Amino acid sequence: MLDANVNNLELMSKEELVEILTKMINGGVALSFNGRRTAQMIQRKVMPRVVHINKELSYNDLGGKCNNLLVDGENLQAMVTLYKYRGTVDLIVTDPPYNTGKDFRYNDKWDTDPNDPELGSIVTLEDGSRHTKWIKFMYPRIQMMYSMLKPNGILAICIDERELFHLGMMLNEVFGEENRIGLINWQKSYSPKNDSVHLSSATEYVLVYAKNKGNAKTELLARTEEMNSSRLLNSNGNRVKWFA
């Protein structure tokens, strides 16, 4: 049975049809949402921008002394524009909107024209399609981040409990569950919220995936004396961790 989101089969490439058939044969868990195929294909419609180098903000005369770039722009369009860097990035750390009802805008025109300059309106908690809009926003960006990474590249993406599970499913689809390195949780507060009705969430998360876990290299930095000096001595004379 075909996914209800799959349509216009005659417009798909051979590779796309093979992908659909492979998933039908192999089965498994898949994230289903309205507009899935559009989200998977939309990056192809993004028009790259002309890059203008601001010499006043650049390091000296750009005479080979610096190999880094600071790009100001919408992230999906920026990644499409930087096509020559695909497959060359070691590490991507990203902090997308958490879909809190206050921090995420969506323009419905992006479903057909991702180049529309309007930011759209705030997606509120009362919006019944808020999760679908967020997934459609994120999916092409995750695809592009995957293509930007080196074979041994790493992605670290921040999120909280609102979209944690949807994000994890998207990353499993694009990167492969076998390439998940881990889930880091960090404590964002040390006291319960006064307005919480049930549980007071005190943590946020960082999902870490490798483009190819077998090629990825982590934990290569040994502890330094400076790191050790950040520990306090307890009554027994041993150094213990402390938190600011």
What residue spans do the PLM features occupy?
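DnaQ-like (DEDDh/DEDDy) 3′-5′ exonuclease domain used for proofreading
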Residues: 1-94, 98-140
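Structured core elements
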Residues: 70, 93, 156-158, 185, ...
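A short acidic (Asp/Glu
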Residues: 81-82, 166-170, 194-195
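Short, surface-exposed basic-aromatic patches at helix termini and helix-loop junctions that form
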Residues: 84-87, 169-177, 200-201
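SAM-dependent methyltransferase catalytic-core segment centered on the flexible catalytic loop
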Residues: 86-154, 162, 178, 203, ...
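Conserved Class I S-adenosyl-L-methionine
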Residues: 165-187
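Short, surface-exposed recognition loops and adjoining beta-strand edges that mediate ligand/DNA contacts
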Residues: 182-198
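Core SAM-dependent methyltransferase catalytic element
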Residues: 199-215
